[in-house]
């Protein structure tokens, strides 16, 4: 049975660039590549900047979907993203992605980390591997 750790491992090590889908203020879909994912306190986190349109879209419509793929395998993660303003959560993510420190700092007003709540992740494969679903 799949776990949140399986989803994390795929995002972090197998398909480190994934697509994040949001909805803009007019209800139009918006999709862009993302590259941050980590587990902190048992939750799946991503990171962005508060000044970005993607963050404004998440605040207005927190239901998002991620699609990460490698070859014939992919995970789709659908759920609500919840901002976490705690310094320790921001520091954890930035320590996991030290290259981001050129643009972000856990003490600045721009850095934000978000975790998935009420999420469902579905694994699919065109290579004959069994489909799996995990929720948290």
What are these regions (language model features)?
Residues 1-6, 48, 98-99:
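Charged, amphipathic alpha-helical segments
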Residues 17, 43, 63, 74, ...:
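Structural motif
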Residues 37-71:
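A short mixed-secondary-structure module that forms the rim of ligand-binding clefts
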